[in-house]
């Protein structure tokens, strides 16, 4: 049985695919990430996290590379620890993921629709990587923050632009 075909066959084609990149700061933080992933899946977003996989046969680095490449979006949960682990010279999964993401962003000419910074608390916004600071980030302290993120992932703006009306008719020159 081809598990890849089975996996994609069960997913609606309109569902965006998202990966969550995060550091295992604590059990509580990992639970927040799991809850977020579960909620996104419940809302029709094909969300992937490492917690859903016990042992990828290709190994963690190749699994992560594949997830980053195949995802429509990568949600990056910034904390102080995430940023520390991503620093040059560190040997960690977060460092590896950061390099993959930065390289993809570089190759796209820094045009970014894919890599989305998120924080569970506003205070962690100071830890967003400088190469992601020019882009919108989402604070998930409230339902409104989550809803904004969900709408972005589903390409469902909160305010729809109205249709453009006809141009004004020319009235001719002004008569003296």
PLM regions and their residue ranges:
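An anion/phosphate-binding loop that grips the pyrophosphate of nucleotide cofactors and donors
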Residues: 71
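A generic local structural motif
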Residues: 5-6, 60-63, 103-104
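Conserved BB-loop
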Residues: 35-65, 80-90, 94
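Arginine/glycine-rich "motif VI" loop of SF2 helicases in the C-terminal RecA-like domain
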Residues: 96-113
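Amphipathic alpha-helical transducer elements in NTP-driven molecular machines
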Residues: 61, 95-99, 143-147
